[in-house]
Amino acid sequence: MTRGRFAPSPTGRMHLGNVFCALLSWLSAKSKGGEWVLRIEDLDPQRSKKDYALQLMDDLQWLGLPWDGEPVWQSQRGEIYEEYLQRLTDMGLTYPCYCTRADIMATQAPHETDGRVVYKGTCRPNPPSPITPHRSQLTVNRSPLTTTTRLIVPDCTIPFTDGHYGKHDINLAEHCGDYIIRRKDGAWAYQLAVVVDDALMGVTEIVRGRDLLLSSPQQIHLRNLLFQSTDDRVQSTENRVQMTDGLLKRKTITDAARCVPTATSLTPQTVPLRQGDERSGGGGLTAHYSPFNVDFFHHPLLCNAEGQRLCKRDKSMDLGYLRGTGITPQEIIGKLAYLAGLTDSTTPITPSELLPLFSWKKVPTEDIILK
């Protein structure tokens, strides 16, 4: 059975971009006769507020987007994340990083077209000699308690097919770099928490904005490390030794098990449910399952008149403002359905009424400007 999820961060009121994502995710799962679960990603201790989360749930119900089962709160799952971080550490794939954002920005220019900087491994164990002096300068007068924890990634290509944007081949070292899995303040980073929760909650379909497209290869690789069977891990031991020795020579991966398992080579580990994980859906999961059967669907972003993606600072687009104007949920859904290409007019409609009309083939790939 398809199990989709909506995983918002409760750092403010939902805006139309969030609702657009929730609607497409709900329609995609429900049109297949599946479940749709809610996970509250309240990992940021400074910005996440329970009141925002409760308001978010009220907004979803008001819109006609009910979820299955009880919501899962990431802030309550620290012990689970600790366990999986330890697994990565035991593999020799994590290291403390002393670099600040300013350090990173000062040593390299933005690499990706969206302005992101790909971390080049300054603090990686046994770095090439040109990096060593810089690292020693960074560690002066810094306590290990102020470090982030990064995951060592291989210099290899992850192939995957997005259900809406098609095939991609992403080189982890070039486009992602060694990424943070625990912040220096102790908070859990997005990638680790998401991968663990999606696997343990039995999520089979991930729908989100195209700005997170590059998270897919990172998460596929991390799933491989955490949930691949022991026998398959042995096949990739040589690759990990090369990584931790700092050998970054580019190579063509002909055996996908050296980087990520293929459908033919995969021997998935059966993952037993643990106490609390049944909260993810009505009645919970009833058996072991493979955490690898995940489909990704990314959607275009809703942007303001200046072409910038909507954010929680766009107050005229948030549900607090919109509900205050007296607009109905059917009007909001009707407008979003029209923008998604599901209908030919903005006629008010409910999510349930949209189910027979839904198809990913109708959804545009270009970002959508709100005027």
Locate each region found by the language model.
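Catalytic adenosine-cofactor/nucleotide-binding cores of aminoacyl-tRNA synthetases and other
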Residues: 100, 214-215, 289, 293-371
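Intrinsic disorder/low-complexity segments
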Residues: 128-146, 228-293, 371
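Active-site neighborhoods of enzyme catalytic cores
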Residues: 52-134, 141-175, 348-371
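N-terminal Rossmann-like or analogous alpha/beta NTP/dinucleotide-binding catalytic cores
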Residues: 1-112, 211-227, 331
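Short helix-capping/linker segments at secondary-structure and domain boundaries
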Residues: 29-35, 201-202, 227-228, 340-347
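Active-site cores that bind ATP or allylic diphosphates and position pyrophosphate for catalysis
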Residues: 102-134, 138-230, 269, 290-310, ...
